[in-house]
From Swiss-Prot:
This is Putative ankyrin repeat protein RBE_1025. Keywords: ANK repeat, Repeat. It comes from the Bacteria. InterPro entries: Ankyrin_rpt, Ankyrin_rpt-contain_sf. Gene3D superfamilies: Ankyrin repeat-containing domain. The keyword Repeat applies. The keyword Repeat applies.
Length: 225
């Protein structure tokens, strides 16, 4: 039986980014706490820990029995969607001349350890990979692809990350394409256009073809029409 007050206190403390309060709540017992309690926006304590880029609170919450890392809020976002939308593109940060793992990188690696589903789609059909591409977050893209994120998933507008890759001002386009080619050598053939590798998806106006392409892992390459 869960203690509603303790569960709510954990949620509010995580939202307030209050390390001491979270530790105090969890120091004696976690069996009475429901870590999956959601607020009015559908967010859990884990959502707030990740939104606040707080690796300490994230780790404490993940150690609670029966915590669900894949809960979606009212927008369909999992914690991974929020992490993908962070602007940091650094694996490491410098403090007093020493290198440390950045908070978002530490949290990402921890979430992978707890088996988070990298291909969950939000209410618009976007995965974490869609948002990572939009944010030019290269290290995040690399980590997602290394943990079985699919580049072939279409959002509700009919676009995969490959279309976004070619329409966004992506600073790491060549590197991302190289990663995709190494992981999906049979599905992706690279073409040279104006001395740069360009890869793109079919347009959303061709309603039936994107789904056929998704089913058969087919990609179209060349000059964007």
């Amino acid at each position: 039986m869960f203690d509603d007050k303790l569960s709510k206190d954990l949620l509010l403390s995580a939202r307030a980014n209050n390390n001491l309060a979270v530790i105090r709540i969890l120091q004696d017992t976690t069996s009475a706490i429901n870590p999956n309690l959601q607020d009015e926006n559908g967010k859990t304590a884990l959502h707030w820990a990740v939104i606040n880029l707080n690796p300490l609170i994230t780790c404490y919450i993940l150690k609670i029995e029966k915590v669900n890392v894949n809960i979606q809020d009212n927008t369909g976002f999992t914690v991974l969607h929020y992490l993908a939308k962070t602007i940091s593109n650094l694996k490491f940060t410098t403090i007093n001349g020493s290198f440390y793992k950045s908070n978002n990188y530490s949290i990402l690696k921890t979430l992978f350890e707890y088996g988070i589903d990298v291909n969950i789609q939000d209410n618009k059909g976007n995965t974490a990979l869609h948002y990572a591409i939009c944010k030019n977050n290269f290290f995040f893209i690399e980590e997602l692809l290394s943990n079985n994120a699919s580049p072939f998933i279409l959002n509700k507008a009919g676009f995969s990350i490959l279309y976004k890759l070619n329409t966004k001002n992506c600073n790491f386009k060549d590197e991302i394409i190289e990663s995709l080619h190494s992981k999906y050598p049979e599905s992706i053939e690279l073409g040279l256009v104006d001395n740069k590798i360009i890869i793109y998806d079919i347009h959303k106006l061709l309603y039936n073809l994107p789904y056929f392409m998704y089913e058969h892992n087919i990609l179209i390459l060349g000059n964007d029409a």
